[in-house]
Amino acid sequence: MKLERVTVKNFRSHSDTVVEFKEGINLIIGQNGSGKSSLLDAILVGLYWPLRIKDIKKDEFTKVGARDTYIDLIFEKDGTKYRITRRFLKGYSSGEIHAMKRLVGNEWKHVTEPSSKAISAFMEKLIPYNIFLNAIYIRQGQIDAILESDEAREKVVREVLNLDKFETAYKKLSELKKTINNRIKEYRDILARTENIEELIKENEQELIQVLQEISKIEEVLPSKRSKVDMLRKEVLRLEETKVEIENSERLLEKRRGDKRTLEERIKNTEEYLEKLKEKEKELEEQVKEITSIKKDVDAYLALKEFKNEYLDKKYKIEKELTRVEELINEIQKRIEELNEKESEKEKLENEKKEILNKLAILEKDHQLYEEIKAKKENLRQLKEKLGDKSPEDIKKLLEELETKKTTIEEERNEITQRIGELKNKIGDLKTAIEELKKAKGKCPVCGRELTDEHREELLSKYHLDLNNSKNTLAKLIDRKSELERELRRIDMEIKRLTPLLTVAEQIRSIEEELNVVNLEKIEKNATEYEKLLEELRTLEGRIRGLAEDLKKLAPLEKKLAALIHKKQELEKELKELNTKLESFGFKSVEDLDSKLRELEEIYKRYLTLLNSKKELEITQREIAKAKETLEMSFEELAEVEADIERIEKKLSQLKQKYNEEEYKKKREEKEELEKELARLEAQKKELEKRRDTIKSTLEKLKAEKENRERVKKEIKDLEKAKDFTEELIEKVKKYKALAREAALSKIGELASEIFAEFTEGKYSEVVVRAEENKVRLFVVWEGKERPLTFLSGGERIALGLAFRLAMSLYLAGEISLLILDEPTPYLDEERRRKLITIMERYLKKIPQVILVSHDEELKDAADHVIRISLENGSSKVEVVS
């Protein structure tokens, strides 16, 4: 695999970065925090998202303030170019882009469906994730793990050399062996449970024969029993039906005899009731004849009473309306007189209004000028309140003093800021010197002479004293800087407050000059007179508007008065006509009419009484007809009932001849005994059939178990063969894992020896790698003897860790064409960093493409291509150096 180009947008500090990689050693150089390692993380995300690395999360790698992240990679594998494009949306999964294509001719074509899952599956086949992460990509911290412990070193070796596949195979084969043993045990348990299967089959077959014989015996006697029971059931049913029919006929006969008695009683009562109705009819006919003789007087009474009611009602309404109309006429006449007086008043007020308007026109100019002066005086008052007790000269002087003080404070703050930066650098240098001095062995890194414990302690004491003094001074300077910045903020606020007051002072001076040139007393007097006249004008106009509104009502009132006078004349005419109609009936007054009505009223009351008799006669005649009809129907029903009684008595006599109670009881008892016997036999047969089916089912299961027993015996033989084969494989995997690890570690030891010898200028002749159970132990050979890692100085330990890790990658160089190293020199001293350049030129150039990330400028000499990354305004910038 070889990387060609990486495009990254909005990934951590990378806003828009494009990097092209070439064959040979590609050095990415830059200060810590510039975005070098972030570029490698972007490559990892582009190739293998979603990752199994905990510290790379989508919502965290998107650049602050950006909504999405874009990564585009072009790489070559086995002569084919591939391109992966990904776009991530912060906080969302929908809308993301994941695409992988290969170059066919001059056209990019998809190799998978455009999804993260499909690309991951394809990449796992093309370049497995573990191979890339362990063999190709040497991350920060892996060298520390090599030096941490024998167990941690074994884990790194296992991951890089992909020895986990042997461990996985060993575990899976062990699990398979356990499964086979469990299966064999299960099958042997089955054989033990079914050992007496033949005896059980024989016993069930004999029991089945016995049950079938018993069923056959019952089936022989059942038909005759069923036939006899059916015959008895029919005979008993016939006798029961006859008995029921006799009982029904007796009940019906008794009912019809009761019906006969009821009808005879009804006929007697109806005849008596009819006689009474005929007597009542005769009396009512006499009363009806009297109605005809008094009918004329009744009609006269009703006509006069109706006229009286109509006369009184109309007279009351006319007189009431006439009174209302006369009252309205008087009221409107008074209102018209009042409106005529208001017309004169309105003309007088109009003349007064004209005089006031003339006076207002003369005073208007002074009034306007007075309003302007009032506004200026109010403005002057407000401005003076803002200014307080200070003069414009005082404010100007204060501002000049504040500006001078601000300049002095800013100069002091800038000097302190510079001193703080110098002290921070000094503190950093002192900490580095202390750490290097603690780790240093042999020569003193300060003076170059031999480093004794006494000399080390003397230097450390001096450095710590200087460090504490610098920290104390730094703390005081930071406090003083904070104090100065607070004072600057206060001064800025005071300047901001005072500056507008200069403008206020100028406005006050201008307004006072304008007010001094006018005759304020005269203008104020005229303005007061203007306001007084204006108020009088408003009052007059209100009164005039009120009078005008009232005068609008005059014409409608005059029209309404004429209409009311006409209506009064009409009502008087109607009243006269009503009295004329009373006289036409022969009465001079209402009293005469009342006298005549009292005379006719007694006749009318008698008429009403007789009128009820006529209605009652009609009702009585209808009741007589109805009684006659009822009597006739009752005689007909009586004849029918007597005929029914005769027929039922005859039928009952015939039924009693067919039925014998003793015979019925005897046959019923015989039937019940036979039914019990039949039920017992059928239940016995059903139970035997159920037992038969159970035995058959048991036999089928036993025979199936017998067949299964033979199959299980064969399965056990096959499983025992598989178990033997699995045990052989487990031993082979175990041996091959040990051989593969030993062979790899032997070669890695040789390569590590060469590289470490370069680092130490031949001080150590060999690196010994020894594999143990879950451990990889490292030794160095010095003066012909193996020495543990504790024998090495701090710098030598770091060099050994780097040499060992490079050796593992070089061991895999025949299989890989790309190596990525992230910060391989963080703890190397200057001499060993120079040695690393020689190692890179000798060993790393064997790999077709190397990408090396470092902040160490010295490595440029060994690189074929140099790319510099720097941080500007929070974004990473890329520059191709060579």
UniProtKB/Swiss-Prot annotation:
Effect annotated for changing residue 805 to E: Increases ATP-induced dimerization. Increases DNA end tethering. Fails to promote HerA/NurA activity
GO MF term list: ATP binding; ATP hydrolysis activity; identical protein binding; zinc ion binding
Activity regulation text: The adenylate kinase inhibitor P(1),P(5)-di(adenosine-5') pentaphosphate (Ap5A) inhibits adenylate kinase activity, but does not affect ATPase activity.
Cofactor binding notes: Binds 1 zinc ion per homodimer.
PROSITE patterns registered for this protein in UniProt: ZN_HOOK
Cofactor (UniProt): Zn(2+)
Result of altering residue 797 to G: Decreases ATP-induced dimerization. Increases DNA end tethering
Gene3D superfamilies for this protein: 1.10.287.1490, 6.10.250.70, Helix hairpin bin, P-loop containing nucleotide triphosphate hydrolases
Matches recorded under InterPro entries: ATPase_AAA_core (IPR003959), P-loop_NTPase (IPR027417), Rad50/SbcC_AAA (IPR038729), Rad50_ATPase_archaeal (IPR022982), Zn_hook_RAD50 (IPR013134)
GO biological-process terms attached to the record: double-strand break repair
Record-linked Pfam families: AAA_21, AAA_23, Rad50_zn_hook
Alphabetic keyword roster: ATP-binding, Coiled coil, DNA damage, DNA repair, Hydrolase, Metal-binding, Nucleotide-binding, Zinc
Residue ranges that the Swiss-Prot or TrEMBL entry lists as coiled coil: 257-588, 629-735
Binding locations of ATP: 12, 32-38, 60-64, 140, 763-764, 791-796
Residues noted as binding Zn(2+) in the record, renumbered to the chain: 444, 447
Family the entry assigns: Belongs to the SMC family. RAD50 subfamily.
Assembly description: Homodimer. Forms a heterotetramer composed of two Mre11 subunits and two Rad50 subunits. Homodimerization is promoted by ATP binding.
Functional note: Part of the Rad50/Mre11 complex, which is involved in the early steps of DNA double-strand break (DSB) repair. The complex may facilitate opening of the processed DNA ends to aid in the recruitment of HerA and NurA. Rad50 controls the balance between DNA end bridging and DNA resection via ATP-dependent structural rearrangements of the Rad50/Mre11 complex. The ATP-bound conformation promotes DNA end binding and end tethering, and alters Mre11 nuclease activity. ATP hydrolysis promotes both Mre11 activity as well as HerA/NurA activity. Also has reversible adenylate kinase activity.
Entry's free-text remark on domains: Binding of ATP induces a closed, compact conformation of the Rad50/Mre11 complex. ATP hydrolysis opens the complex.
Name used for this protein in its record: DNA double-strand break repair Rad50 ATPase
Record organism: Pyrococcus furiosus (strain ATCC 43587 / DSM 3638 / JCM 8422 / Vc1)
UniProt gene name: rad50
